[in-house]
């Protein structure tokens, strides 16, 4: 028996974590690479070129308890939804596939700020006060504003919504 050096601790030794994260991320990248719209490509690249974001995205949980409630759960959930969007979009010729696939990627990214997953999963203060939809919208708007020339209507089309939000 000895002392455990918490600086060398790997949380995956103590809490449930996605085991094949690199493989799941590769699946996600392959599908997103099929997005042809230049503005959407720039937006997607802005996320994947951002190492601090990627580190947090790879580790984030998608929920506190109901689904994908483990480290890496947000990556897994996002990949599954992007796969579904890419598969279903061609069934609806009037739908812009690139927009649907990109929106599927964006839809829960606010959970990076909404949830924290240490030894236990819980909501952050921002998560309790405003939630992942508002946080995700702000994240997306900040990124699109940083890309010169992104059409404003495209920003509006990408605003994530949630079935729990009531219409006015």
What is the predicted function of each stretch?
Residues 76, 87-168:
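Divalent metal-dependent catalytic cores for phosphoryl transfer on phosphate-bearing substrates
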Residues 7, 17, 71, 75, ...:
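Metal-centered catalytic cores of metalloenzymes
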Residues 10-16, 68-70, 124-128:
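A ubiquitous short alpha-helical element
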Residues 31-36, 66-73, 85-95, 147:
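Short helix-to-loop capping/linker segments positioned immediately adjacent to catalytic or ligand/cofactor-binding
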Residues 40-44, 71, 133:
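Primarily single-stranded nucleic-acid-binding OB-fold modules
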Residues 55-76, 120-124:
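Active-site flanking loop/helix segments enriched in acidic
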Residues 2-58:
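Extended, charge-rich, solvent-exposed interface segments
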